[in-house]
Every structure is written in structure tokens, then in C-alpha cells.
Amino acid sequence: MALEMRLPVARKPLSESLGRESKKHLVVPGDTITTDTGFMRGHGTYMGEEKLIASVAGSVERVNKLICVKALKTRYNGEVGDIVVGRITEVQQKRWKVETNSRLDSVLLLSSMNLPGGELRRRSAEDELAMRGFLQEGDLISAEVQAVFSDGAVSLHTRSLKYGKLGQGVLVQVSPSLVKRQKTHFHDLPCGASVILGNNGFIWVYPTPEHKEDDAGGFIANLEPVSLTDREVISRLRNCIVSLATQRMMLYDTSILYCYEASLPHQIKDILKPEIMEEIVMETRQRLLEQEG
């Protein structure tokens, strides 16, 4: 196995211009946002000497007279309707604890999920005893945020057939602030793989199924070997997502696909080299700018 090691002095510094939005007002803790007293103080700010000062590093967002700072690197703050990817950490009475990259563990109630086969009925004691047969510790799931409690904890549900247990694939963890909010977060890419872009920063990359298992009730038990071609596509997509996240570019289906196409001249293992990563991301950014016109 070939290994490549570089000394810190030999590494090329990444371009600071990449991943930065010129239109956004970036601040660090202690920066003065405004001296106008007509604005309301929001999250990530505080008043000091009649000035509105940032308390976290991030971008300034204004809604009418409300000013807040959205942190660039933070834990996931759940919102109703968000699509998330999570990992089961504990099986409890009539519920599962799920790790979703938030400050507190999320909760998936037994009554908030589809039974295998999509059967609709009241949950019985037999269902409660068979909970570990449905989902056990370590299983990955896709779900939707049903409610957010006062302490910030999130309640999930998987009642739709497109949610449920995930099969074979690769999990990539990025900052939640890099995942662009869209109408749908389930994408079948033309390269032969699919992605689930969780609003919580967990991205699931998996081979596109030949037929949709709508009758499985959200439970995927496909354990057939994945072909070498599919594994190479998934590995390339994974490295492209890591490259975009390293350069602080927003992640959505178009940016990931453009980055994948830009990486095709290079070997999969070389994509994460700093100079190649910068070249690929610059080409991706240029194509996105041309598309926007």
C-alpha cells in the first residue's frame, strides 16, 4: 500500500477566496455589527456600549429589524420538516434514541414509524417486544423532524415510505451550515449513485436501487454485494463531498454532481490532495457561476 506524507512547510496553503461569499457579512466574536439603536438583538449577538456586538463567528442575517449571527460551525438545531440522517444509539421503552449531530439525542417513538410492510394499526405489546428487531443499536435511518421541544431535543417520525432504515452505503459528516435547504433532499444522480442530504450534516451516499421498495414499509434489507463500479462511484462522490466541505462550499445535488464531473480526470485517492482539491472546487465554482448567469 502506497502512502504519501507531506511536511507542513511543503503543503500548499489553500486559497482563502474559495468558499467565501462576498455578499455575506462575516464577523468574529467582538466585532461591532452596527451602532444603530433601531435594530433588535437576536441569537449570537449582545449589546455593549450602545453597540450591537457579535458573540459567535458566523454570517450576519437580518429579518426586518432583527439581527442575528448564524454560526459557521455549530451543532444541528432542529426545525420542523427537516430531513435528517441519524444513528440509533439506544432502544428504550416505546422509543429509540437517535444521534443526529444535535446537542441532545433525538427521539423516535414506536408510534411514529411504519411497521414492516407498511401495515397501519395500533402498536401492541408484541410490537414493543420486537423493537430491536425493527431497529437496533448502530442502525442508520432517514427521518423527518416532527417536533422540537423547549430544551432543543428533536422528535422524529418515519411514517412516509421514503424514510426508514438505510442499507448499504457511506456516511459523510459535514457541518450542518453547509447543507443547502431545498424542496427535496433525496437525489438520484446520473452517475449511478444516490444521496440523502440531511439537514443535520449527515450525508448518506448509496448505490441507486434498480426498483423502489415501496412495499417494504421503510425497511431496506438489501445485503447483496455492491459491484466494484458502484463502490468506485460512491468513493469518488464521498471524496468530492469532503472536498466541497473543506472549501466551505454549499452542498446540494448540482454542486456535488459538478464536482464529481470535474474529478473524473483524477484518481479517487488523489482527489483529497490539496492542489487537486483546489483545482476541482475552482472548476465547480466556475460552472455554478456560469449557470447562475
From Swiss-Prot:
<dbReference type="InterPro" id="IPR012340">
    <property type="entry name" value="NA-bd_OB-fold"/>
</dbReference>
<dbReference type="GO" id="GO:0034475">
    <property type="term" value="P:U4 snRNA 3'-end processing"/>
</dbReference>
<keyword id="KW-0963">Cytoplasm</keyword>
<dbReference type="GO" id="GO:0071034">
    <property type="term" value="P:CUT catabolic process"/>
</dbReference>
<feature type="domain" description="S1 motif">
    <location>
        <begin position="79"/>
        <end position="159"/>
    </location>
</feature>
<dbReference type="GO" id="GO:0071051">
    <property type="term" value="P:poly(A)-dependent snoRNA 3'-end processing"/>
</dbReference>
<dbReference type="GO" id="GO:0003723">
    <property type="term" value="F:RNA binding"/>
</dbReference>
<dbReference type="InterPro" id="IPR025721">
    <property type="entry name" value="Exosome_cplx_N_dom"/>
</dbReference>
<dbReference type="GO" id="GO:0005654">
    <property type="term" value="C:nucleoplasm"/>
</dbReference>
<dbReference type="GO" id="GO:0005829">
    <property type="term" value="C:cytosol"/>
</dbReference>
<comment type="function">
    <text>Non-catalytic component of the RNA exosome complex which has 3'-&gt;5' exoribonuclease activity and participates in a multitude of cellular RNA processing and degradation events. In the nucleus, the RNA exosome complex is involved in proper maturation of stable RNA species such as rRNA, snRNA and snoRNA, in the elimination of RNA processing by-products and non-coding 'pervasive' transcripts, such as antisense RNA species and promoter-upstream transcripts (PROMPTs), and of mRNAs with processing defects, thereby limiting or excluding their export to the cytoplasm.</text>
</comment>
<keyword id="KW-0271">Exosome</keyword>
<dbReference type="GO" id="GO:0000178">
    <property type="term" value="C:exosome (RNase complex)"/>
</dbReference>
<dbReference type="InterPro" id="IPR004088">
    <property type="entry name" value="KH_dom_type_1"/>
</dbReference>
<dbReference type="InterPro" id="IPR026699">
    <property type="entry name" value="Exosome_RNA_bind1/RRP40/RRP4"/>
</dbReference>
<dbReference type="GO" id="GO:0030307">
    <property type="term" value="P:positive regulation of cell growth"/>
</dbReference>
<dbReference type="Pfam" id="PF14382">
    <property type="entry name" value="ECR1_N"/>
</dbReference>
<dbReference type="Pfam" id="PF15985">
    <property type="entry name" value="KH_6"/>
</dbReference>
<comment type="similarity">
    <text>Belongs to the RRP4 family.</text>
</comment>
<keyword id="KW-0698">rRNA processing</keyword>
<keyword id="KW-0694">RNA-binding</keyword>
<dbReference type="GO" id="GO:0005730">
    <property type="term" value="C:nucleolus"/>
</dbReference>
<dbReference type="GO" id="GO:0000467">
    <property type="term" value="P:exonucleolytic trimming to generate mature 3'-end of 5.8S rRNA from tricistronic rRNA transcript (SSU-rRNA, 5.8S rRNA, LSU-rRNA)"/>
</dbReference>
<dbReference type="Pfam" id="PF21266">
    <property type="entry name" value="RRP4_S1"/>
</dbReference>
<comment type="subunit">
    <text>Component of the RNA exosome core complex (Exo-9), composed of EXOSC1, EXOSC2, EXOSC3, EXOSC4, EXOSC5, EXOSC6, EXOSC7, EXOSC8 and EXOSC9; within the complex interacts with EXOSC4 and EXOSC7. The catalytically inactive RNA exosome core complex (Exo-9) associates with the catalytic subunit EXOSC10/RRP6. Exo-9 may associate with DIS3 to form the nucleolar exosome complex, or DIS3L to form the cytoplasmic exosome complex. Exo-9 is formed by a hexameric base ring consisting of the heterodimers EXOSC4-EXOSC9, EXOSC5-EXOSC8 and EXOSC6-EXOSC7, and a cap ring consisting of EXOSC1, EXOSC2 and EXOSC3.</text>
</comment>
<dbReference type="GO" id="GO:0000176">
    <property type="term" value="C:nuclear exosome (RNase complex)"/>
</dbReference>
<dbReference type="GO" id="GO:0071035">
    <property type="term" value="P:nuclear polyadenylation-dependent rRNA catabolic process"/>
</dbReference>
<dbReference type="InterPro" id="IPR048565">
    <property type="entry name" value="RRP4_S1"/>
</dbReference>
<protein>
    <recommendedName>
        <fullName>Exosome complex component RRP4</fullName>
    </recommendedName>
</protein>
<keyword id="KW-0597">Phosphoprotein</keyword>
<dbReference type="GO" id="GO:0000956">
    <property type="term" value="P:nuclear-transcribed mRNA catabolic process"/>
</dbReference>
<dbReference type="GO" id="GO:0000177">
    <property type="term" value="C:cytoplasmic exosome (RNase complex)"/>
</dbReference>
<feature type="modified residue" description="Phosphoserine">
    <location>
        <position position="124"/>
    </location>
</feature>
<keyword id="KW-0539">Nucleus</keyword>
<dbReference type="InterPro" id="IPR036612">
    <property type="entry name" value="KH_dom_type_1_sf"/>
</dbReference>
<dbReference type="GO" id="GO:0071038">
    <property type="term" value="P:TRAMP-dependent tRNA surveillance pathway"/>
</dbReference>
